């Protein structure tokens, strides 16, 4: 997955899909309102007809929205505005990513990161979105001879900020989120590997490789080191294994 940061009007974005939020009682977020204005009330008309009410967990995919340059517009329900906190924000981003993966769109511009979250900064919103984006892209297919590809995967995600002076801060937050996301993905992969592959030696070699790539220190403990440190519980678990503890 390729991530980037953007700033601009949603109706002027070229791409496969633009993602904007709607609160309960059909209240449009500023990016959604911008698209609504450009489309002469197209979104408002749909909401008044009952196509969507903004409840948390709901999504509505629209094609060829008048006044926009993108192929699709995805409306994401954010729930009650007064209750929009960390949990609701992360849930809305997850719902958006799931809906995007179901559409077959290969790129998207996500404006949910512009929606304020109580006591949270722009950097926090971007960081969380990047982590969730990496999470949605995770696949463990190392031992699959045939991959189940029903449609193209989402490959590029752009997260937006409202002000251009927020771009540098958002870029830093994006890098942090990507790094955390990659770490989580590695941990999941190591956990998914069978024991005869992910041996203590394999773990040690993986750690050493990461240390080499990022110029950080890494110390691998041998059996004698563990005995000296009193790590008897760990040693007793591995005692019957033909593989070395490290």
Predicted regions span which residues?
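Short amphipathic alpha-helical segment within the helicase RecA-like ATPase core
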Residues: 1-246
């Amino acid at each position: 997955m390729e991530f980037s940061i953007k700033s601009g009007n949603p109706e002027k974005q070229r791409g496969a899909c633009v993602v904007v939020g709607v609160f309960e009682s059909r209240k449009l977020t500023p990016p959604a309102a911008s698209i609504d204005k450009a489309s002469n009330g197209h979104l408002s008309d749909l909401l008044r007809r009952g196509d969507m009410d903004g409840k948390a967990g709901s999504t509505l995919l629209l094609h060829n929205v008048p006044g926009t340059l993108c192929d699709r517009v995805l409306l994401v329900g954010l729930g009650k505005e007064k209750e929009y906190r960390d949990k609701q924000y992360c849930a809305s981003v997850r719902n958006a990513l799931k809906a995007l993966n179901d559409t077959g769109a290969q790129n998207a511009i996500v404006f949910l990161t512009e929606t304020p979250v109580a006591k949270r900064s722009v950097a926090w919103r971007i960081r969380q979105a990047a982590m969730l984006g990496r999470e949605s892209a995770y696949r463990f297919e190392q031992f699959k001879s045939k991959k189940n590809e029903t449609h193209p995967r989402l490959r590029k995600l752009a997260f937006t900020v409202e002000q251009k002076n927020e771009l540098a801060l958002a870029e830093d937050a994006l890098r942090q989120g990507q790094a955390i996301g990659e770490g989580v993905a590695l941990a999941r992969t190591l956990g998914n590997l069978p024991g005869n592959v992910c041996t203590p030696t394999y773990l040690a070699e993986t750690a050493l490789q990461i240390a080499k790539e990022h110029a950080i220190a890494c110390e691998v403990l041998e059996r004698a080191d563990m005995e000296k440190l009193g790590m008897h519980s760990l040693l007793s678990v591995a005692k019957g294994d033909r593989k070395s503890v490290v």
